[in-house]
Amino acid sequence: DRNPADGLRMTVSAGANVGERLMAVGERHYGNIRSTATEWLGRVEIASDRIDDQPRAFSGGMRQRLQIARNLVTAPRLVFMDEPTGGLDVSVQARLLDLLRGLVSDLGLSVVIVTHDLAVARLLSHRIMVMKDGHIVEQGLTDRVLDDPQAPYTQLLVSSILQV
């Protein structure tokens, strides 16, 4: 099972987790680091008064959002997400997906998402690639592939979701 703490330093503050990424790309001014970290905590819906709290005091959903801030603060051109909602309660997943969708749109990010959850793929992806045993079985625009799957394996995936 996924652990949202992966990639976070649990013994330093939320602000430091974000700030470390800025320092890694050359930012040295403490005031700038702290204000940018505060801004990014807000963007991922973590209250600014939690900036000095350690991630171990956060819920799984908050840790996941902190990880998002940490990874996006340096404005990468490409982001890789491996099961971004894995290990989270369904109620938390919907909010996280909504947040991710907004950030991807606002920042104009290119994102590669690995997921077994077709709802996640539908919400976050313009294009989809369905793989089985390491081989591509179907690819194309997400809505087309999921609404009218051509490959038998894709048809099976889509129909198994509909029967749940």
Predicted segments, located by residue:
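Conserved ABC ATPase "signature" region
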Residues: 32-49, 158-159
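C-terminal boundary and immediately downstream tail of ABC-type ATPase nucleotide-binding domains
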Residues: 45-46, 146-164
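Conserved ABC ATPase signature
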Residues: 54-58, 62
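Conserved catalytic motifs of ABC-family nucleotide-binding domains
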Residues: 75
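A short, surface-exposed alpha-helical micro-motif characterized by mixed small hydrophobic
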Residues: 121-123
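ABC ATPase "signature
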Residues: 139-140
